[in-house]
Amino acid sequence: SEIPEGFKEARGFHFSPLPLYPLAELINTLPEDAWIQVDPHYEWFFPEYREEWERILRRVSVVLPSEDEFTKFFDIPLAFDIDNYKKHMRELSAMGPPIVVLKMGPQGAILYLKDEDVFYSIPSCAEHVVDVTGAGDSFCGSLLYNYVSGDDIITAAIKGMVGSSITLENTSADENFHVAEGVAMERFRRVEASVREKIKIL
């Protein structure tokens, strides 16, 4: 549960799914003002762990559950009931994170900004789906990188969708690690306007 001191100077930290207790230990080693993004582990994001999550989420800037994880955590039906989802996204944000991103698979994502008390529906920009493995991870990583690099959160989320769309077209992790430089930015420029037109305030 140790993070090298040099790493602690990073502009942001993303925690992919980890068991609950190592996750808490790692987060507690980071500076108080660190920008921390957490993608919950599906085996640990359940109501019985709520107290532990409340302690963890006090330190978290962005939490990004999948729809399945989110509905299990709040013990609500997996059915797109936007009013019910909004209620529980606010509840999740009240535990600490000013930003909640609900990953919705082919439907894209719902983004909640606590400071504005506003929900945005961010559509997917997938063009050709070969393998869904890693698409959510690419979304999370792209969103974090672009946000801490200076983009506003909506632009960062669109770039997250672009990263996800590229991963969806590949058949292996090796392909994902060898995407040519500039491919993502070229796609972003091509799809940005059409994606922004489809973004809705919920």
Residue ranges and their predicted role:
Residues 17-22, 42-46:
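Short beta->alpha connector loops
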Residues 81-202:
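Conserved phosphate-binding/catalytic region of the ribokinase-like
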Residues 1-21:
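Conserved phosphate-binding/catalytic loop of the ribokinase/pfkB sugar-kinase fold
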Residues 3, 52-53, 129:
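Acidic, amphipathic alpha-helical patches
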Residues 5-8, 24-31, 93-95, 182-183:
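Alpha-helix C-terminal capping segments
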Residues 40-44, 125-127:
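Short, acidic/turn-prone active-site loops that include or flank metal/cofactor-
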Residues 21-29, 51-55, 155:
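A short acidic, amphipathic alpha-helical/loop segment
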